[in-house]
A protein has these predicted regions:
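Ligand-binding pockets and gating/stacking loops
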Residues: 1-202
Length: 202
């Protein structure tokens, strides 16, 4: 194995090197090759599920509590509320029922942006073309996200025999236990195939 050694943890930075626990990468100023292993797994297994990946965070969202990084080296959104997670996975939001029109509008906007960028590309020098290529790559990724949302927007969410009645966020056992329960349910219902649960400290 290679790339698993992280010398930064030997330099007395306390909890700060935790940002690289899933990526083996500590320098927050450089983003190249900083994808975390959970997101690499999501890239391979997450194309057939409602959620490509899910990242749960227990407790306060501190600078060094971010451990999931996308292929651009950017932090992946973390959810810290069990109720929000439950609703995301299993509850139908009334707003979701009207999202087909919104998604169609999003696709139209992306098509227009893509056409405009491609028309500009021919008039640019090599450096600017490289930047446009990066921009178009980002546009394509957003387009894939929109298509994914459109595909799942008219498909029913799974039903589970689980509720959060009596849940007390102030109880460490309740809080962490609920996050772990929801992680298991997300996998059991095949809502995702990549779940990361971050439990910093209390």
């Amino acid at each position: 194995y290679s790339g698993l050694r992280n010398p930064a943890v030997q330099n007395g930075f306390g909890h700060t090197p935790c940002v690289g626990i899933l990526s083996g990468y500590f320098n927050k100023l450089r983003r190249k090759n900083r994808i975390s292993i959970d997101q690499a797994v999501a890239g391979m297994l997450g194309n057939e599920t409602r959620f490509r990946s899910l990242v749960f965070q227990a407790g306060e969202n501190l600078d060094f509590s971010q451990i999931a990084w996308d292929k651009h080296g950017l932090p992946v959104h973390q959810i810290d509320s069990p109720r929000k997670i439950f609703n995301l996975l299993f509850q139908v939001n009334e707003n979701e029922q009207t999202q087909q029109q919104i998604l169609a509008e999003d696709r139209s906007i992306l098509d227009a942006v893509f056409r405009q960028a491609k028309s500009m590309e021919k008039r640019l020098n090599a450096t600017d073309r490289a930047k446009i290529d990066e921009y178009l790559t980002s546009v394509r990724e957003v387009e894939q996200t929109v298509k994914r949302r459109a595909y799942w927007s008219d498909r029913s969410k799974p039903q589970v025999a689980y509720d959060l009645e009596g849940f007390d966020r102030k109880s460490v056992d309740d809080y962490v236990g609920a996050l772990l329960d929801l992680a298991v349910l997300a996998l059991q219902t095949d809502s995702t195939r990549a779940v990361t649960v971050q439990i910093p400290f209390w």
